[in-house]
Amino acid sequence: MGRVIRGQRKGAGSVFKAHVKHRKGAAKLRAIDFAERNGYIKGIVKDIIHDPGRGAPLAKVAFRDPYRFKKRTELFVAAEGIHTGQFVYCGKKAQLNIGNVLPVGTMPEGTIVCCVEEKPGDRGKLARASGNYATVISHNPETKKTRVKLPSGSKKVISSANRAIVGVVAGGGRIDKPILKAGRAYHKYKAKRNCWPRVRGVAMNPVEHPFGGGNHQHIGKPSTIRRDAPAGRKVGLIAARRTGRLRGTKTVQEKEN
């Protein structure tokens, strides 16, 4: 079967440790407190910074602690249109303005939001990548649930108490600009993880990959492989139910949750 292939070598390594040395910190909403539940709290955008390994910029927002005589600085995912010196309001009674943080239950239907909480108090999990946004579709006052459309197109029912930032995540259109040079890809993935460059299996020799070898680059066997194949052969489309392009009239697959 030849050498130990790339997939086997990856499995034998240590547990992946993220490249976080130069990162600025975790982008989260404020920890929910009495001020946000019943009124609002005012903060000011001190700085908009780049975070290595992340497409979207981050906003440093300074809040006055409602319980102690000190200031707290939070890192928010920056919404498009915010600027340094802008006041940001967080809470149930905050106004519906770009950059403010409100519960989705208080927002009108059709509102564009980002950094949405999946569960109340988890400080933002959905629609956080650059240019992404979710849309508030409908409210159910009886069950206190809100339906939102996620960037993938799927629709999700979440609690109306979940908070979100009003607006679209900044940095949209980032992937429209082509990388053009290998050097740019090198620096991009150096900040993220060791997954570049990736040599294709058909470009290898037969000892290095099941798809390697031949007088021209071709797989020479089915690209699908059974689930219980040995590790050195388990490459390609593993236990694929189907292959090929999805054809038909259905463009957005709506998942009902």
Swiss-Prot record:
Gene3D superfamilies: 2.30.30.30, Nucleic acid-binding proteins, Ribosomal protein L2, domain 3. Coiled coil: none annotated. GO terms for biological process: cytoplasmic translation. It holds the Pfam family Ribosomal_L2_C. It comes from the Eukaryota. Belongs to the universal ribosomal protein uL2 family. Keywords: Cytoplasm, Ribonucleoprotein, Ribosomal protein, RNA-binding, rRNA-binding. PROSITE patterns: RIBOSOMAL_L2. This is Large ribosomal subunit protein uL2. Component of the large ribosomal subunit. It is found in: Cytoplasm. Component of the large ribosomal subunit. The ribosome is a large ribonucleoprotein complex responsible for the synthesis of proteins in the cell. One of its GO terms (molecular function) is structural constituent of ribosome. GO terms for cellular component: cytosolic large ribosomal subunit.
